[in-house]
Each structure stands twice: as C-alpha cells, then as structure tokens.
Amino acid sequence: MNTTALLIGLGPLLGWGLYPTIASKIGGRPVNQILGSTIGTLIFALIYAWVQGIAFPSGMNLWFSILSGIGWASAQIVTFKVFTMVGSSRAMPITTAFQLLGASLWGVFALGDWPGAMDKVLGGLALVGIIIGAWLTVWSEHKDAGNARTLRQAVIWLAVGEIGYWAYSAAPQATNIGGEEAFVPQAIGMVIVSIVYALFLASRGEKLALVEGVSYTHIISGFFFAFAALTYLISAQPNMNGLATGFILSQTSVVLATLTGIWFLGQKKTTKEMWVTIGGLILIIAAAAVTVTI
C-alpha cells in the first residue's frame, strides 16, 4: 500500500467520522439535517461528475442508483432522529454494527460469501464480536430505567433504519456501472427523499424546512459525507486499496464519530465508560477486519 492509497483510504475516516458531529453541532431538526446534507451531496457529486466528464447512466442502472440514494436518505433520517434520543456518540457505534451485520449476512446468503465451514465459523464469531462491541459502547456505569428504555427504543429504530442502509449498498450491485457513475443518481435519490420528507412534515403543521436557513447551513455537513463516499469509491478500486482493505479503513470512521461526539458535543462518559467504549470500538473494527479477510 503506497502513501497516496493510504491517504485516500483514510478519507472516509475524516468525512464519515466528522459528518455526524458536524450535523449535530449545526443543530436543527432531523429534517433540516437531511435536507441540507443531501443538497450538499448532490452539489459535490455534480461538480465531481462535471470535472471528470462522467456520463449520466440510463435505464435500470439509473433507477437502481436512485433507489440506492433513497435507501440511504431514509435510513439517515432515522439515524438523525436517534441522535436526538441518545446522542451521536452512542448511536454511531450501534448503526455501524448493524450495517456490518447487514452487509455480512447479505454477502453470505445472497452473494455466496464465506463458502467453507471454517469461513462460516470465523464469520459467525466476528458477527458476535460486532454485537458485543456495540453493546460495550453504550454500557452505562450508573443504571437508569429511563435511559435504558430510551436506548432500547433507539436500537429498535436503528435496526429498522438498517433496511435503508442495506438498500444503499445492495441496489448498486444490480447495475453494471461503477460507483462513480452511480454517484449523481444516488444523490438525486437522496434529495428526493429529503424534499418529500420536508413537505410531509409541513403538511402536518411543522415549519417547512425548505425555507429555514439552518437547512442550507447543513450543506456543509453534506460536503463531508460526499467527500467520504467518493474517497471510499476510489479507495475500493483494485489499483488503490481494494474492496476489503478499503472497507476496513472506512470503518475507522466510527472511532472519530464516537470520540468527537463525546469531546465536542458534551455527550459525557465516566472514565470507566470511556475505557469500555474504546474497547468496544476496537472490537468492532477488529471484527470488521475479520469479515472482509475470510
């Protein structure tokens, strides 16, 4: 692995690692966050496609790419909602764990990954490790019935949201185009969801997010997400880091997302909780490394 490949591979660490913290810091409602983020992603994708001269896909390639973006935006709305319940430092390790579980199980049952018996044993142990790691990140030294109930609700919401993240990853596999070509249609799907969501909430009496300034401030956070998505696509190419190594490098973003949430958003933990959280993060990343190297 050369220095250029490594730096590109760490792009998602910065982009996806800082994205939830920046979005939470800017504030606003989940609808403001998703609207600005998706507009920022679309602007970034359009500029990149124009600079690189990337053709716009058509037919089923176009529709599956848009579906992919719809899946991500739908899931991200759920994730933003959970941020308001338990904070990004708790939500991010859980949603990362669900995404790893979903991607691994989809690979096994739909794509034929882990074909041997030993592969399945190692993979199963890795999935257990991911679950334990996620649990460690939300462990609380001082038990509180109200907090425990809220956390259970958050976990259920994130489990439902995983359906959207799964669609984001799985839909492009039904196309015969590369990730860079799918980037703009994905962003279009994301914006469609955010606008529909904003109009739906407005019809129920909430202020229309399209006329709120904070929505457009969130374009900044959208640039961070788009930067991460693009550098991951480049990193995963065979002449860079390859899919397996690129994926592992991208998952390090959960560490930055969790720690910046604690340090900059006031999502406090005791010393013991902090050490347990770090242990959980290490376990999640180690288990992710196992799943892609089997």
Curated annotation (Swiss-Prot):
Pfam families (alphabetical): Sugar_transport
Keywords: Cell membrane, Membrane, Sugar transport, Transmembrane, Transmembrane helix, Transport
GO cellular component terms attached to this protein's record: plasma membrane
Topology within the bilayer: Multi-pass membrane protein
SUPFAM superfamilies reported in the protein's UniProt record: Multidrug resistance efflux transporter EmrE
Highest rank taxon of the organism: Bacteria
Localization per record: Cell membrane
Transmembrane regions: 5-24, 34-56, 61-80, 90-112, 121-138, 153-170, 182-204, 214-236, 243-265, 275-292
InterPro entries: Sugar_transport
Principal location listed in the UniProt entry: membrane
Single GO MF annotation: carbohydrate transmembrane transporter activity
Stored PANTHER family: TRANSMEMBRANE PROTEIN 144
Family the entry assigns: Belongs to the GRP transporter (TC 2.A.7.5) family.
Protein name: Putative ribose uptake protein RbsU
UniProt source species: Lactiplantibacillus plantarum (strain ATCC BAA-793 / NCIMB 8826 / WCFS1) (Lactobacillus plantarum)
